[in-house]
Amino acid sequence: LEVHYQFLENDDFSFGLTGGFRNYGYHYVDEPGKDTANMQRWKIAPDWDVKLTDDLRFNGWLSMYKFANDLNTTGYADTRVETETGLQYTFNETVALRVNYYLERGFNMDDSRNNGEFSTQEIRAYLPLTLGNHSVTPYTRIGLDRWSNWDWQDDIEREGHDFNRVGLFYGYDFQNGLSVSLEYAFEWQDHDEGDSDKFHYAGVGVNYSF
């Protein structure tokens, strides 16, 4: 469940706020036997868009999460912060360039806990192309720093990773509130421990604005 409220929106400055709640239910089998877990996540997330010049804008969002209940079972840290923010330069009505800094960090406010902590830092670059009702956006994610300790029960040492991605997003706006999208991405991952991984992502979306 998420609720968004737009406090202010005009060409010079926009500011909104999203609040949310999610429940996670787990049913699994481990060595001692069958078990269940039930975890909750609370979210608050401001977003903004600021006009710096006619062609240059500063925008982004910041999500703050709080996790509760059965964290030792699920392995999650109790707190998480995620943000993506940066600059967009518009060359003309067709072409723009957006370069963002992305951070996701899981940590524990309770000093007695260390499970589920991680950090991800990336540079994300987008090249939005607008052609009438069509929009095409090639993009890339370049890993700056990434580590995790998801296996804290067996090995408290942090494991380093290197994730990079290239992708393509396509959208079509029917100009009646309805829009559809297609997306494909390829990601390669290198790890301090274990083999490298490669992933293909594909997505289809339908959106309706009232």
Segments from the language model and where they lie:
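Residue-level signature of outer-membrane beta-barrel architecture
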Residues: Y5-F7, P46-V50, D54, T85-V95, ...
